[in-house]
Amino acid sequence: MRLILFTCFFCISSFLFAQNSKSVTYHLDENISYRDAEPKNNDDYMNERCRLDIYYPDTKNFTTVVWFHGGGITSGNKFIPEKLKEQGIAVVAVNYRLHPKVKCPAYIEDAAAAVAWTFKNIQKYGGNPAKIVVSGHSAGGYLTSMVGLDKKWLAEYGIDANDIAMLIPFSGHTITHMTIREERGIPDTQPVVDEFAPLYHVRSDAPPLILITGDREREMLGRYEENAYMWRMMKIAGHTKTKLYELDSFDHGGMASPAFEVLLQEIKALE
């Protein structure tokens, strides 16, 4: 399945979002610790990295996007994507611990903790916990899929992963992440599908899954094909709400900009 997206379509959708949101005031609360209630696990590095920012409108019942940055699980920092600002939604931008200071599954645990924090706190800001979307680019897309498909991570916090309204990974691994393979001494050209691969956790009852990649000829090698296989296997498993978008002419980094337009279009279903 190959969906080619056209700029004019997204310009129109962005304009409509902006029109709906132009009179709304937005607030930004920064560097909130999302694991400070876990003193037994706390250390200086956790205290430094396990923080989030929340950008939110002064309205009620809004959708929230939990956003995980990319960087190969070795680099990167939280940010509020410009294309998600002033769209009538909240954005929770998350920092998480990174290799080599930690190893798997520390960063997956952090991602789950941040999503759980959002479920438990978003009503205080006016958001609807039934309208929480999880998304991220590259490594962030991988974390998105892991916390949404392998239910054990959120279950640690008393949260059912099926309560996530939508999963929207941007160009994320669906096999075991290359950094996890590196930690095990496995070459990055050797694919692995084990418990740390989203593909291992395909299931019919998962939240709606919107897979987005760049052009297969310009993406990181194999990234489109991984996601296409994920799309197919979710269909075979009986999941009826998986979509796959391939953004024609965009590479791995460049695909994020038009992918935000896809995200905004998809989450309109939650209004």
Question: Model-predicted segments: where are they?
Answer:
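N-terminal cap/lid segment of alpha/beta-hydrolase-fold proteins
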Residues: 19-60
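C-terminal catalytic histidine-bearing segment of alpha/beta-hydrolase fold enzymes
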Residues: 212, 228, 235-271
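Short amphipathic alpha-helix adjacent to the substrate-entry channel of hydrolases
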Residues: 77-94
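The feature captures the conserved acid-bearing segment of alpha/beta-hydrolase catalytic domains
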Residues: 158-180, 189-228, 232, 236
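Bacterial Sec-dependent N-terminal signal peptides
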Residues: 1-24
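Primarily recognizes the serine-hydrolase "nucleophile elbow" in alpha/beta-hydrolase
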Residues: 119-182, 194
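Alpha/beta-hydrolase active-site loop
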Residues: 102-123
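Short beta-strand element of the alpha/beta-hydrolase
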Residues: 61-71
